[in-house]
């Protein structure tokens, strides 16, 4: 299954595409769509919509996963983010794709980062899961979007047994994520 994850924003909208293929998580692509802050918001949203639609056509995902809104102290920032999320939801709906939304805390948890962990921890875990070099993910927007896609691949498959004491082989995205997490949590001297 191929999933396009979206980290919405009106200035920088990250997208990341991950596919579960023959028991492996494969990085298909990612990018950051830049909105011109000099443009009126309506024009910026139009441009974001066009670029995200182009990504949907290029990568042909089976589903779109969008990060939800978190609590803001600034109401204006929350409204603008809501508009950017609306653009992502609209582009997916126009493409006829199912859309799934995940809270930021759930996304962090899905990749093994905790609530207090920052974007660097999320990026590090995404690189671990997808076996990417540090130089590949330049912006947090792209790594956050890949984390949202990983969250979707893991969500709903948690019922798959992670591993048994008998050593039976694990299956599904949840097991793949667990396998990739194990080395990341080893102490440096144990690596």
From Swiss-Prot:
Protein's UniProt keywords contain Mitochondrion: no
Catalyzed reaction equations: Endonucleolytic cleavage at a junction such as a reciprocal single-stranded crossover between two homologous DNA duplexes (Holliday junction)
Residues bound to Mg(2+) 2: 67
Compartments (UniProt record): Cytoplasm
Cofactor(s) demanded: Mg(2+)
InterPro entries: RNaseH-like_sf, RNaseH_sf, X-over_junc_endoDNase_RuvC
Enzyme Commission number(s) from the entry: 3.1.21.10
Enzyme active site: 7, 67, 141
Segments passing through the bilayer: none
Binding site for Mg(2+) 1: 7, 141
One MF term in the entry's GO annotations: magnesium ion binding
GO biological process, one term: DNA repair
Keyword annotations: Cytoplasm, DNA damage, DNA recombination, DNA repair, DNA-binding, Endonuclease, Hydrolase, Magnesium, Metal-binding, Nuclease
Function description: The RuvA-RuvB-RuvC complex processes Holliday junction (HJ) DNA during genetic recombination and DNA repair. Endonuclease that resolves HJ intermediates. Cleaves cruciform DNA by making single-stranded nicks across the HJ at symmetrical positions within the homologous arms, yielding a 5'-phosphate and a 3'-hydroxyl group; requires a central core of homology in the junction. The consensus cleavage sequence is 5'-(A/T)TT(C/G)-3'. Cleavage occurs on the 3'-side of the TT dinucleotide at the point of strand exchange.
Subunit composition and interactions: Homodimer which binds Holliday junction (HJ) DNA. The HJ becomes 2-fold symmetrical on binding to RuvC with unstacked arms; it has a different conformation from HJ DNA in complex with RuvA. In the full resolvosome a probable DNA-RuvA(4)-RuvB(12)-RuvC(2) complex forms which resolves the HJ.
Family: Belongs to the RuvC family.
Protein name: Crossover junction endodeoxyribonuclease RuvC
Organism placement in taxonomy: Bacteria, Pseudomonadati, Myxococcota, Myxococcia, Myxococcales
